[in-house]
Amino acid sequence: MTIGLSCNALKYGGGLERYAIDLARGLADAGVRPLVFARSFDSSVPEYQCVEPRRINVSFLPGKCRDAWFSWRLRAARRAAPVDVLIGCNRVDSSDIAICGGTHLGFLDAIGRMPTFSDRRQIALERRQYARARFVVAHSMLMRDELRRFYGLSDDKIRVLFPPVDAARFTPVDAVRRAELRTRFGFADDEVVLLFPSSSHERKGLPLIEAILRDAGPRVVVAVAGRPPERTSERLRYVGYVKDIEDGYRAADFTILASKYEPFGLVGVESVMCGTPVILPSNIGCCDAIAPSAKLVFAPGDAAGLRGMLDEAVRRVRAGAVRVESGAAARAAIQYDPSVARHVAQLLDLAAEAASDRRNGGR
């Protein structure tokens, strides 16, 4: 069975780019060398050696036309390859297994925006993608609900598979190593540090967090990792782009987000696997994957609720009831198997079923 993988780019990045890299590596470990269809490839990453690259050029087109062109060209490219089962990690209407790491209608609903002409084009492509796929893999219960509500999909088409996380990378450290990391990031021993990893501060809720921070107790700090915030202060600090983000999690006391829309939020799972609990709104998809002991949850946009959770976080830090140093205990707070191997095995099972359906005359 020849497996194809479609993505915007095969490179180290965030979101579905990172997910595609994980799949390429996991498929290689399972003895599968996929054909990867993408707009661009980073040939320097190790995973590039694990795939058969097939570039679909979109660089000559305006940005808003590229999704539709890529999807159109992919139909012919998969036939020519040929590919038995295509896993689509971007908006394409010829995938057998469509990966849903977010929906455009769900995003617009969450931020309260009416669709533009460009939005409607993206939504139409999404509808075709989900309608034509044999399976749609939802990366969270939230995505499953959006697929039902906005796209009318039935449960027999949807499979909920939480995304994988590198368990070898995201692990706790002992107290000595953690103290070294806090020194590296400039965190004082008596500070309560809330890590805010983000490249999209408005969507991730930084304005709400800033407003609450003004009323927080002394020595409470929000450390922004990623894109620089518009302003900083003694309480709102910028620690730069942290490539080894696992060390940022380990140095902090909590990781915090107040996102308006977050289909899953790998940040939450990664942080907990590093032994650091999280403060999250209930609309973040990963809340369903984290044990109650490792999270403080508030209603989306609820300033009073966030203030209460922040007070509770400070109380726990001052009482020494926060950190987890045992890898086993950290993994136990994640309520699914986050390994890449397990996730890929589940996808290969779906691929076998989709291939069987195609041979028998189904989609």
From Swiss-Prot:
- Top-level taxon of the source organism: Bacteria
Reported EC number(s) for this entry are 2.4.-.-
Q: SUPFAM superfamilies this protein is in?
A: UDP-Glycosyltransferase/glycogen phosphorylase
Kindly list the GO molecular function terms attached to this UniProt entry: glycosyltransferase activity
* Membrane-spanning segments: none
Question: Effect of gene disruption?
Answer: Disruption confers resistance to cellular contact-dependent growth inhibition (CDI) CdiA-2 of B.pseudomallei strain 1026b, but not to endogenous CdiA. Alters lipopolysaccharide structure, decreased binding to B.pseudomallei strain 1026b inhibitor cells.
What Pfam families has UniProt attached to this entry?
A: Glyco_transf_4 (PF13439), Glycos_transf_1 (PF00534)
- The answer, when asked if Ubl conjugation is one of the entry's keywords, is no
* InterPro entries from the UniProt entry: Glyco_trans_1 (IPR001296), Glyco_trans_4-like_N (IPR028098)
Kindly state which keywords UniProt assigns to this record, in alphabetical order: Glycosyltransferase, Transferase
Please name the top-level EC class of this enzyme: transferase
* Family that this chain belongs to: Belongs to the glycosyltransferase group 1 family. Glycosyltransferase 4 subfamily.
Role, per record: Probably a transglycosylase. Probably involved in synthesis of the outer membrane receptor for a cellular contact-dependent growth inhibition (CDI) system.
What name goes with this protein?
Probable transglycosylase BTH_I0986
Q: Which organism is it from?
A: Burkholderia thailandensis (strain ATCC 700388 / DSM 13276 / CCUG 48851 / CIP 106301 / E264)
